[in-house]
């Protein structure tokens, strides 16, 4: 429900989803897109093109960093402005890769946009909102560390927080491997 609500709140025209896997986030973004007539662009290394039947959904099977360089041309070929209203990042969870994603994709963000990052609090064992436990893996703070470097600050990802950093409202939920939402101020 959080992904849907965050996306709907900006009345998006273009939602970019980096990392599809089983399509859970695609499902939420597709429903948000239907309300505003937005296009959803999903990028993944694996073939995930059966995840949606939404007519304005496009799947690209490619490395998301490589595709970022082709994004303006892709937008032109689809009669879209290369301005992202919602950027969702849920890919490798590795520091260097996430840092590159932020560097390559953030310049395409619209004036009023959101960036949503999943797995910003990865541990070997994690706690869900219902207090049950799940098994994860320690990614050496990959996603949150890349975000810290991008915004020039430090975060305690083990705790929920709301703060302002480098022109962004930053909201973070620590449970279930962490979810962090940036909203441009």
What role is predicted for each listed range?
Residues 1-185:
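S-adenosylmethionine/decaboxylated-SAM
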């Amino acid at each position: 429900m959080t992904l849907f609500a965050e996306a709907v709140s900006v009345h998006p025209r273009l939602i970019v989803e980096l990392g599809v896997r089983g399509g859970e986030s695609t499902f939420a973004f597709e429903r948000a897109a239907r309300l505003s007539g937005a296009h959803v662009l999903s990028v993944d290394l694996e073939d995930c093109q059966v995840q949606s039947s939404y007519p304005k959904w496009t799947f690209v099977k490619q490395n998301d960093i490589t595709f970022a360089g082709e994004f303006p041309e892709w937008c032109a070929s689809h009669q879209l402005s290369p301005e992202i209203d919602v950027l969702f990042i849920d890919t490798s969870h590795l520091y260097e890769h996430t840092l590159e994603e932020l560097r390559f994709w953030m310049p395409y963000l619209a004036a009023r946009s959101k960036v949503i990052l999943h797995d910003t609090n990865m541990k070997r064992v994690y706690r869900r909102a219902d207090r049950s436990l799940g098994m994860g893996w320690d990614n050496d703070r990959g996603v949150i560390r890349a975000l810290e470097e991008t915004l020039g600050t430090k975060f305690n990802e083990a705790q929920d927080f709301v703060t302002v950093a480098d022109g962004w409202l930053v909201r973070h939920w620590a449970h279930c491997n962490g979810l962090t939402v940036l909203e441009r101020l």
